[in-house]
Amino acid sequence: FLHRKEVVIIPSLEKDITGHADNMVRFLDGQTVVCVESDSIGRQLQTILQYHGLDVLEFPSAPDEDRSGVRSYLNYLETDEAVFLPVFGIDTDTKAIAAAEKLFSKPVEPVMIPHLAADGSGLHSISWGMSW
């Protein structure tokens, strides 16, 4: 799928205590990544990833004043049947759902996770170790 021969070091979100890159950037295929919108960290990510030859698409993020390292729409869970998109009960949820519906050809299922996010995780992160 990736067939990459290099490791790219990326910055972390200031409030992120987990160090999970899946809060900021996700591979869609071997050449294309989706990353948080062009806030400060998003611009750094885009520059780094484009320098390494990747195509970069932007995805909405929660407002800066509300976002922690785990309040991320990019920490979605993708299965063969659907994309489960984390939402938080905030205004930008609608924008993120619309963006996901354009990005993926399978159904997008919003999942309210404010308590899960507050505890330091997201949908993709909690799925590690599960067999699909």
Regions found by a protein language model. Give the residues of each.
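Histidine/cysteine-enriched polar flanking segments
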Residues: 1-132
